[in-house]
Amino acid sequence: MILKNIFKKSLWGMMLLPLITGCDDEFLVEKKDFSGFNEEIYNDVQTAQAKVDYIYYLSLPGGTTGGSDDFSKSTEEFVGSSKFTQLSEVTKSNVNDYFFSKSTSGPYAFIRECNMFLDNIDNGTLTEDEKTPLKAQVYFWRAWHYSKLVNTYGGVPIVLTAQNAILGEGDITQSDLAVPRSSTAKCIEQIIKDLDLAIAGLPGSWNDANWGRITSGAAAALKGRVLLTYASPLFNRNDDGARWQAAYDANLAAKQLLEANGFGLADGTGNRAEKWEKIFVTPKTSEAVITVLHNTVTTDSYKKNNGWEQSARPKEAQGNGGYGATAEMVDLFPMKDGKRPGESTDFTYDPLKFYKDRDPRFYRTFAFNGVVWPYKQDAAYTVWSYQWFKDDASFISGKEGQGFAEYAGRVNTGVYVRKRTNPAAEFSATDKFSRSATPYIEMRFAEVVLNLAEAAVGIGNLNEGYEGLKAIRNRVGIPAGADGNYGIPAGLDRDGLFREILYERQIEFAYEGRRFEDMRRWMLWNDDATINNNTCARLGVEPFNGKRHHGIILGVKPEIYTASKSGLSYDVFNPLSPIYNETLVTRAGIAVNPNAADADFEAQIALLDNFYGTNLARIENDQLDPLSPRFEVTYLSKYYFLGLKENVMKQSPYLLQTIGWDDYYGNPGTFDPLAE
């Protein structure tokens, strides 16, 4: 009893650090390392729960997932070269270590925490009813970590008990610690076994105090994601129908289980998908299958803030500077009728006035010149990011201008990523936007719908694939059209529907950290006969290799105004500027609000059209990816499965290197991630 009280009062006075919301301080937990406590914690449900919560804390993804990192810069979403797309080859010496990382903070360290719990929980005095949901949550997180490893490497060592760190007699290759890489198939089998145990032991939903914990539906949805990945071309080069069937069965079961417990597609309608935008900032929504909650607390021991808001906001609004959207992403989004730009007969795409007549989600994904991007202290904050140039030659150079309408600092392209920011975000003079409690949704119900649609197409149920796509588009207000297809081409074959589903995922999940994994599992950087990869040709898409990222500069036409200095004092269009020229078509009175009623919105767009058409030209900024030497995306075939870093092989010489990579001694790797 004394030990129990010490744990309760000194270490875990309040439960659920990883799961708290921003509006309820009652559930704050002090972050403590819970890795070293003995088996007595398993005699009390609260201390055992605290151990589980510590595993959540170690395992939950960060709120800035989907930002500008090596993964997203390898896709169309962000500019710049990444480690995986630059001209120099990644080798065993400089490849990132996603395998062991650090002994205390890598995936196997987290798996060890799960194993320690599962090894010891049955030795305590808890009842079966108390133990079952605790064990089920830990089974989920063990499967989670193994699924990440398998996605990256293929087969990895399967360790299901907490190993003793003492080697004993002999060298490491003869130790019980020397666990070799299992086949990918064996790893998938173990992941599914853990997830089935999680599904069986978890409730379908939790009460408000425990909102954010893993449910049976979440475990089923992860199972569906894992099996869909295993059925995809990365792992399934011969297009084995049995794998698609397993993925279909798992995703159908996940969808049905989630729906039976109150989950589903949240309402995404409203003016230009206003309610869809709210999905990303609402702590409790039917869309959130796997979610990470945050708080607004500033005390280090209790703080769990989401850094996305601060990172995404422009410097003009006191943010860190924002995420710049590429021209490739801006031009990609469908038109208002759901058809691709250039394919719609009702809406003509104008690259200068790229904001006109777009998919409703466009206005919730991007922020551009003249659009209102509110926060709590300034509901009328309007983005202005045009540039001006000192002469004609500078204007046509494809480089940034010499003057900028963003006086506090600019983003690297004239369009911002707005998605996942909170229109009611609170700004403070001391913390700016850093105390954000906006949740991060790791898996939305929309993904379950599209996972099921893709698996349905995989087994030949094309109509079911169409229905999944239609459901996603219908819920954001895209019109069905005369053919009832919501802009989706009719009569597509299997590969054509795969292409449309991947396109829809690119729109629906933009800047959520999904695109890189979709490109990997469909091998969209190249076609390579040496590894039996022809998916780009099959789908009718251009490989991403050989491409460059571009920014959009909205430049003031030289015949209207040229200057060589930046700032308010040199901006002729800003009514607050000392050289404001009211005889020009200026920005006065322009504030395009996506929340406005349709008639008001169209009137606002007309004013913006006049400003753009009179004053601005679109310049493709080709300077954002490296030029010397000239960078073009170069994702090598061997990167589809990463190799082990040399320090891993030095410490664990029994681990075979992946095919395509050199082992520690410089010999070709022999481990085949595709071997059964």
Regions inferred by a protein language model and the residue ranges of each:
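Bacterial Sec-dependent N-terminal signal peptides
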Residues: 17-43, 191, 224, 453, ...
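Short coil/turn linking the two alpha-helices of tandem helical-hairpin repeats
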Residues: 150-151, 157, 229-238, 460
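Flexible, polar/acidic helix-loop-strand segments at domain edges
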Residues: 348-444, 661, 665-676
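Long, intrinsically disordered, low-complexity segments
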Residues: 23, 107-110, 190-192, 272-339, ...
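Conserved, well-structured interaction surfaces
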Residues: 44-53, 57-58, 84-154, 176-189, ...
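Glycine-rich, aromatic-lined ligand/substrate-binding cores of catalytic
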Residues: 286, 290-398
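Membrane-proximal, proline-rich intrinsically disordered regions
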Residues: 23-67, 72, 352-356, 649-655, ...
